[in-house]
Amino acid sequence: MAEKYSAESIKVLEGLEGVRKKFNIVELSKKVKKKGDLLVLSQELKIKPRILNSAISEGRILNLLPSIEKSKAGILAGLKTDREVKIFAEKYDIKITSARRLIKLVRQWNEEVQKEPLLLVTQEEHDLIIGSLMGDASIRQREKNNCFRFSHSIRQKDYSKWKTQLLKEFNISEFREVKRKIKNSFIHAIDFSTKTHPVFNYYRKLFYENRRKIIKKEMLNQLNPQSLAIWICDDGSYETKQGYIILCTNSYNLEEHKLMKEFFKEKFGLNPTIGFRDGKYYYLRFKQKDTKELIKIIKSFIPKAMFYKIGEKND
């Protein structure tokens, strides 16, 4: 049984092997649940964050696969989510596979999910990411991998929680209320971010060129009723008096709006008009008839907290 944690007992430890010998790393891994926990524990135990992080990653694997050899746990720690550890363990016989072979297989897996995300993400998660990225969500690059981020008004806190629940598999690094000063006023918002993962590299490549988010047929072709519903929740606005929906697609240029207009006509039989305001912003507006058809397409996928986006009360 591991000794009680203390600064005195940790001073003699040297590197990862010392942490393995001194502590139950499975129990250590359970102590890190949110952003900041690793640093606090590192300071408490006087262990370098990088070394402690490696130990905690191994502990997570040993917690999921108690019978796995400890030498293989460090290799499998390259699989960042619990789900993919289980998928990987089912796909390969990890008990008899050599450590050298496992290194290659883990590297291969991380390359594969960057090309085919549905090896790991569910269709519902994929649709949420696609729909959100059509709106104001972003993919941020950090070193070689990326993370998924969004920010919503505090009025959409329930919607933010709903998204967070759907994406909990991807190790949430941030979910917090913030206040930002924009010009002479403050905006109260919810900021969300996952930890980095190779699978988000796929979405970065799909949506970005030269660090700018763009619209192209490849991404539009992935839109279905569920991802479209998320897009409407993020960027849609219902005009109550006249009964139509506007998509506030301000960050895209005219050619991209023409592409979106063509897509809606071909995929959903809708014919939005391209609007222009303030001398610089384009948007899409659905006429009353098309708005009714659009609502029929997406309503079953709209969270109740966002029913106002389609002109209904949030019951």
Regions found by a protein language model. Give the residues of each.
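General secondary-structure propensity
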Residues: 4-8, 28, 38, 112-123
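Short, Lys/Arg-enriched, disordered terminal segments
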Residues: 1-3, 314-315
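Short, Lys/Arg-enriched anionic-surface-contact patches
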Residues: 20-29
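N-terminal, well-ordered alpha-helical segments
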Residues: 39-43, 50, 157, 161-165
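Amphipathic alpha-helical oligomerization/scaffolding segments
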Residues: 31-40, 44-48, 55-113
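P-loop NTPase nucleotide-binding/switch module
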Residues: 2-20
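Generic structural marker for isolated residues within well-ordered, non-membrane alpha-helices
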Residues: 16, 38, 85, 216, ...
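Internal intein/HINT superfamily modules and their associated LAGLIDADG
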Residues: 110-315
